[in-house]
Each structure stands twice: as C-alpha cells, then as structure tokens.
Amino acid sequence: MKALHFGAGNIGRGFIGKLLADAGIQLTFADVNQVVLDALNARHSYQVHVVGETEQVDTVSGVDAVSSIGDDVVDLIAQVDLVTTAVGPVVLERIAPAIAKGLVKRKEQGNESPLNIIACENMVRGTTQLKGHVMNALPEDAKAWVEEHVGFVDSAVDRIVPPSASATNDPLEVTVETFSEWIVDKTQFKGTLPNIPGMELTDNLMAFVERKLFTLNTGHAITAYLGKLAGHQTIRDAILDEKIRAVVKGAMEESGAVLIKRYGFDADKHAAYIQKILGRFENPYLKDDVERVGRQPLRKLSAGDRLIKPLLGTLEYGLPHKNLIEGIAAAMHFRSEDDPQAQELAALIADKGPQAALAQISGLDANNEVVSEAVTAYKAMQ
C-alpha cells in the first residue's frame, strides 16, 4: 500500500506519518519546508521520542518526501492508495488544487483503484471541507468520476505534539505523548476498509469528535487560559495548581454531562476518560506552553468550538455550566504579543465592552443570561 501525507511538521511526522510507516505502508511526505524535505530524502528515516510514564525513542524508516507545490505531488496522487493531511485547517484550501490536478491525472491514466483521502486536522469534519475545496478546483467532467472512485473520509485525531525542543537541532526529531487516538468514519471509505494499527473505525464519528472537543480541547484551553492568568508557564504547572485543576475538571464534567445526554456515553467510562486527560496534562516530558495552547482565542471562543459549543449543550439540556463560564471568562483575558487574534480580542473588548464583544465573537445573544454570567466572571478576574 502506498500513501502520500501532506504536512511533514511535528504532527505529520510524530503521529499520522508514524502510524502509516509503522504499518508497513510506503510513505511519502509532501511539504513546502525544503530543509525538512532534504533531510527526509537524505536519510529516509527520523526519530520520534514517545513520552509518558517512561520515555522511548522509535525510529521511523523507509520514508521519502516531495514538494507539495511541484509536479511530483500530482504524479503521486495519480498512483497512491491513501492521501492524508496534517497541515492545519487554514492550509486545506491551499493544497486542494494540487489534489484536484492529481485526481484528473489519475482519471486520465485510467487508474480506477479506490483512493481514500483523510484530513487529520483539529477540526470537525475536516475532510468534508477539503472535499468542497477539491470539488471547486476540479473540471466539471471529472467530478462524477471522483465521486465514484475517491473516498473522502472524516476523522478525529488526538495526540499532544508540542513544538520540538531538540537538543541536537535535528529538523526531523519530534516528541509526542504515548496516548494517541485516530478515529475514522468507516461509512465514507471506497473499496476495502484498511487495517492500520492505531486507526479506529466507527460509524458514529460525531460522538467521538465531540467527546474529544468537549474534553481534551475544552480542558486544554481552560488550563491554558487560567494558567496564563495565574502566571504559570506550562500546562503541567497550571494543572498542578489545585484551584485551576478544580475548574478544569469541573468544566470537563459539565461538558461530559452533555455528551452523556446526547450520545449515551457510559458515565463511569467518561469519568475515567476525564482522569486520563488530566494525567496527560501532567506529563512532565511535554513542555507544553500555556501561550501556545491558548493562541487564537477568537476561534476558540466561536460558536462551534471548544468553549461555546459545550456551553450551548448545557443550555439545551438544562445542565450546570459554572466552570465552563469561568473558562470563557479566562479566555477573554488572554493576551499575547505574538498572537494577532489575542490583540484583536483585546481591541474588541476595549472598543465594545466585554458583553457586546463576547456576543459578537461567540454568536450568542448579548442579552443571554450566560453572556452576563461570563462578563461577571471576567470582571471578577480583573
């Protein structure tokens, strides 16, 4: 089996690329970073530090790389069995034209073996969005052929991969946590379902997408925002602060009550999942900076994201949300010189006041009681 993976960054190399290569799949990375491309093509291998209770070093081998903006990537799409991405939500639109060209070439070459495309991004139904961009870039006479022969498979991914702090200055070395979860929608595949260790198949993807969003992402963000306010540097330092831990755990329990109502998750198993995530935040090997985790607060405070979406769920089912409100208030305080969204957030609050600003960012009605609750909590933090 041959695969092409867009994005040779830390997540691409440390998570999806590693799973594919470990499964014995012939893997080519596509990226724009020439230093990384040259290193991959010179060595055909790289090291991954897997850290949890213990630390181990795995070697990923048998890989190569191409530029994601050249002809090679188009040729590969015409040949491979699987295309995956870990490029970030914003970049999906940029890689779509190359994918479209490759699919046209595949059709012209008469290659009718099934191709499946899986976007492995920190977003809901990212592959469906990528499919929209690809379809827009395709000529009309190729669209029906693509619908018939190409599967666009949505997935949920979860693995903490902090920015590399390689002591060796090796551009390929990467550190990842032991935990990883890659759940894919088995109803969207074309052809035979793949058997890749570490890839879980489900016919109820949204339950797992929201479980991750409402637990890991919600908890991670609130830990970062409260941690930054309290002067902590890392996620570990923040979650070891008992006051912060109580709010984070409380928020995950509040969002968890929504998941249990909505999808019928087992309450005891979900409580264990929350404990596992708190343990991941404590990982001493992951030097995960609160500023990195907190960045892009406007996106994280938007209606479909990790803070407001679970809050809306608590309103839908008439459930408590005190800790989620604390997290939202802390997010409104997030300031970072390196993050344009943090600066935009500050300007919006200064211009409109916290109530109107939060309403605009979140899509909530300014007169909604929860907006007032968040503003009260926000002011109490000043």
Swiss-Prot record:
Classification via Gene3D superfamilies: N-(1-d-carboxylethyl)-l-norvaline Dehydrogenase, domain 2 (1.10.1040.10), NAD(P)-binding Rossmann-like Domain (3.40.50.720)
Alphabetic keyword roster: Acetylation, NAD, Oxidoreductase
Family: Belongs to the mannitol dehydrogenase family.
One GO cellular component term noted in the UniProt record for this chain: cytosol
Superkingdom to which the source organism belongs: Bacteria
Native source species: Escherichia coli O127:H6 (strain E2348/69 / EPEC)
Protein name per Swiss-Prot or TrEMBL: Mannitol-1-phosphate 5-dehydrogenase
Alphabetized PANTHER family for the sequence: ALTRONATE OXIDOREDUCTASE-RELATED, MANNITOL-1-PHOSPHATE 5-DEHYDROGENASE
InterPro entries according to UniProt: 6-PGluconate_DH-like_C_sf, 6PGD_dom2, Mannitol_1_phos_5_DH, Mannitol_DH, Mannitol_DH_C, Mannitol_DH_CS, Mannitol_DH_N, NAD(P)-bd_dom_sf
Residues that hold NAD(+) according to the record: A3, L4, H5, F6, G7, A8, G9, N10, I11, G12, R13, G14
GO molecular function, one term: mannitol-1-phosphate 5-dehydrogenase activity
Catalytic activity, EC: 1.1.1.17
Reaction equation(s) it catalyzes: D-mannitol 1-phosphate + NAD(+) = beta-D-fructose 6-phosphate + NADH + H(+)
Annotated positions of the N6-acetyllysine modification: K269
Any one GO BP annotation for this protein: mannitol catabolic process
SUPFAM superfamilies in alphabetical order: 6-phosphogluconate dehydrogenase C-terminal domain-like, NAD(P)-binding Rossmann-fold domains
